[in-house]
From Swiss-Prot:
Belongs to the porin LamB (TC 1.B.3) family. It is found in: Cell outer membrane. Pfam families: LamB (PF02264), Sugarporin_N (PF11471). GO terms for biological process: monoatomic ion transport; polysaccharide transport. The gene is bglH. GO terms for cellular component: cell outer membrane; pore complex. It comes from Escherichia coli O139:H28 (strain E24377A / ETEC). This is Putative outer membrane porin BglH. Residues 1-25 form the signal peptide. The keyword Transport applies. GO terms for molecular function: carbohydrate transmembrane transporter activity; porin activity. Residues 62-73 have a biased composition (Polar residues).
Amino acid sequence: MFRRNLITSAILLMAPLAFSAQSLAESLTVEQRLELLEKALRETQSELKKYKDEEKKKYTPATVNRSVSTNDQGYAANPFPTSSAAKPDAVLVKNEEKNASETGSIYSSMTLKDFSKFVKDEIGFSYNGYYRSGWGTASHGSPKSWAIGSLGRFGNEYSGWFDLQLKQRVYNENGKRVDAVVMMDGNVGQQYSTGWFGDNAGGENFMQFSDMYVTTKGFLPFAPEADFWVGKHGAPKIEIQILDWKTQRTDAAAGVGLENWKVGPGKIDIALVREDVDDYDRSLQNKQQINTNTIDLRYKDIPLWDKATLMVSGRYVTANESASEKDNQDNNGYYDWKDTWMFGTSLTQKFDKGGFNEFSFLVANNSIASNFGRYAGASPFTTFNGRYYGDHTGGTAVRLTSQGEAYIGDHFIVANAIVYSFGNDIYSYETGAHSDFESIRAVVRPAYIWDQYNQTGVELGYFTQQNKDANSNKFNESGYKTTLFHTFKVNTSMLTSRPEIRFYATYIKALENELDGFTFGDNKDDQFAVGAQAEIWW
């Protein structure tokens, strides 16, 4: 716009000169014409420079405050940025046209960050994602992960998980908005150089569309501010990040739901979703598909005191079985489906110096309770690796969790994840029906903060679990892990800032392995590993 104004002014200044030159053309020689044109050009250049200086003074934003060295005459020694100069703090943007009665500049200052956000909002498209990848080697051949869900992730994971989300706004008028959302997730193998999907050596390379739905605002008169969605989408997940499993997880093949519905002091999330399961027979060789539906209800963000909020949640899963499916269960050895539920509460406390801690209490029965009893990963699934089986007899399990991070002074930060669980008369995937279990797992991750970009610390993990089967036989599983690490970061938070690059050395030992019989390479019960890993989200 500024350049067009300069060009227009130049044309206006040249126009009368051109007219005068035309009227005198017949009486002037060529030399005289050139002399007049050169004089007019010098005058025009002088006028343009004067106009440019005035405009520069008038519209330079007050928020831009960079120190510029000057010479003895007071002129800037280098008033124009070079290719190596830092990017400006702000840009000039033209405001909407002012009325005749309004005064002031038609330009205003906007930071580059705000300008970038404005452009993104105007386009209505966003691309978000997550992935991790890295290299590692171990003392007994290829490095192996063990009990990540109990001992912690640092120096104990060798997968290349990713999530990629595409979101496009397709309508935003009259207080109504519609967005299309697609998410892909999966894993890229970290063992072989080839990672073709479908050529799934070692079960490493896979991908799925985990989300494909439409979300809206403003279409429900009783909840205009809420997000109303339809399609393949589950309820929001809540993760214990250090242990890499979820306390709240409701997957979906398809569903309908409402999120962030303001009711009273808090907000309601509600989802009705379909998630069919493969019901197996007792040989675990034959299966049948059973249609199941889940209702997930949460009342969240309930204020308690300063920086503290409460959530109350409930989930119920039921089957819609055909007559032939029930007949297979009654007469052909297929496991009976049993409805399952989970309910609980969680409290989140944020701290004045940064950081937070989340405490949760959850109770479940039947197949969800069975997953409470898993030491490796304990997300509240209704199946085991996608397979529904087991004699579920109404047994229950309880889980108490704590996770978070806290700053200690200016140079120390500590993250934690502590879980205590027990269950009675549940089906255990290791010890069978009518099992009892009790477990505790604890991981602490203290670190020294050198600066915003560097931390050095240690992750210490320990767990122990005992199962008792129907005959009162006891089975124990336990182990510990020590990981020394140094991380390159972009902020000091351990749990909420990424990207992060870590260098680690890990010693991990299985003290007891009566539940899974796990061993590391060379049939050893321990492993020393070193490596580097990158983790990023955007």
